[in-house]
Amino acid sequence: SDYASQTIEGFLGSIYLHNRSAKLKDLADTLTYYEPLAPAESFWVSNTYRKGELKVLDTEQKDYKVFLGGTHGPYRVLDGGYHTGRNMLMVCDSFGNAIAPFLMPYYDSVYMVDFRDEYYSKEAAQGGVAEYIRRCGIQDIYVVLSESEGVGTAFINQLMPANLK
């Protein structure tokens, strides 16, 4: 592999953060994460305006927030300087945070949106997603969801249709 990797021992994940079960703590795992192939930048975005820089890999974190420092909304953009002439949007929950850096070599910009209420509102986004796609010149859209946000959930049945307009 061309990717350099690092590991975090004692990784507990999101489920542990929600219930702090001692049984889960006994099942701690090793998390392997991969560094981007080229230097990358990440920004919190409202509409098309970059509001603040965020880390692509937050190696000071010892949990799932190592990936992009966690979820930020209403939008996030990753730039890797690959000059492909293409942009993409990933509609995702937090699982997209681990996957987005792998898509950077194929796009100028990787945009991300998480429609869960704590991260997204049309007011904070200053408009709808369809307009955002047009303004950012996005050609491809990926949907990356964990099982808990997948088929048959409110994310798919309500949040996505309501916010993609």
Residue ranges and their predicted role:
Residues 1-165:
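Extracellular glycan-modifying ectodomains
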